[in-house]
């Protein structure tokens, strides 16, 4: 298996417009950063698998079907009969930028536990990828960190996207501490220009990524929205400009970029 992703898959209720009475209309779209990355890489030919947990409900069944239809192995996807599939309400402004409201308290993805993640799946993986959303609460935090540590010992390349969502954390200080905790295990890191100062205390890509590289991270991407991406590989750094285009919705853009890079 080329890439195994661990974490959340959820429903993005995305506003699509308003009806004739001005009532907002929403579409139920599949989402969740690790799942998005698995799909993006699979579409480019990589063999991918997703490990996570959904509810025993219509949304959970739909998400499993969507991943399978996109050639993502879902054999490691658990179903929780007692907790619902996670949902996020996503509003998009005129520039295509997003605002998230999560309905996640006691949802299925948070209930991922160590026993849900098989040793066989980790042994088979060339790359094991995770994000910070599964680090916001236990038992998913402990399960994710345990799986990543096991995968590292088994020789997998560890990739990480902090994917900061302020309203999922108790406070900013807790978020920073938890997002930093797994960095010594990471081989390849993707952060946004919003997340770089949270992890390093600076907005400067050169000095910020140099700090991160000292933790043993071999390859670092800093996504810059319309301005493209900054990268560091050891002592070598560079910038790739963004391609001008009409933006409809930036949701999943970073996941798609990282999935393409890893594939």
Residue spans of the language-model regions?
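Glycine-rich phosphate/adenosyl-contacting loop at the front of the ribokinase-like
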Residues: 1-73, 77, 246-248
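Conserved phosphate-binding/catalytic region of the ribokinase-like
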Residues: 1-4, 149-153, 201-263
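Proline-centered loop/turn at the N-terminus of a beta-strand
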Residues: 2, 47, 157, 188, ...
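Short beta-strand scaffold segments in enzyme catalytic cores
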Residues: 39, 87-91, 228-231
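Conserved N-terminal subdomain of the carbohydrate kinase-like
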Residues: 47-130
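Conserved beta-alpha-beta core of the PfkB/ribokinase-like small-molecule kinase fold
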Residues: 133-210, 228-229
């Amino acid at each position: 298996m080329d890439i195994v992703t661990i974490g959340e898959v959820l429903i993005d209720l995305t506003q699509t417009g308003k009806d004739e009475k001005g009532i907002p209309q929403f579409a139920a779209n599949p989402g969740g950063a690790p799942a998005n990355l698995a799909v993006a890489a699979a579409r480019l030919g990589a063999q991918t698998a997703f490990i996570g947990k959904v509810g025993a409900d219509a949304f959970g069944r739909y998400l499993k079907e969507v991943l399978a239809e996109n050639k993502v192995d879902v054999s490691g996807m658990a179903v929780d009969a007692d907790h619902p599939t996670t949902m996020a309400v996503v509003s998009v402004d005129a520039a295509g930028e997003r605002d998230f409201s999560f309905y996640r308290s006691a949802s299925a993805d948070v209930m991922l536990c160590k026993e849900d993640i098989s040793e066989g799946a980790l042994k088979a993986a060339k790359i094991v990828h995770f994000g910070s959303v599964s680090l916001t609460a236990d038992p998913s935090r402990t399960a994710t960190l345990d799986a990543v540590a096991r995968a590292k010992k088994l020789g997998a390349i560890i990739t990480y996207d902090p994917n900061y969502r302020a309203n999922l954390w108790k406070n900013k200080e807790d978020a920073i501490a938890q997002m930093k905790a797994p960095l010594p295990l990471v081989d390849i890191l993707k952060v946004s220009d919003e997340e770089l100062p949270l992890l390093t205390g600076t907005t400067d890509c050169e000095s910020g990524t140099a700090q991160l590289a000292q933790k043993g991270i071999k390859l670092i991407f800093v996504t810059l929205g319309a301005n493209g991406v900054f990268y560091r590989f050891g002592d070598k750094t560079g910038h790739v400009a963004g391609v001008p285009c009409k933006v409809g919705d930036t949701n999943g853009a970073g996941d798609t970029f990282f999935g393409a890079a890893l594939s």
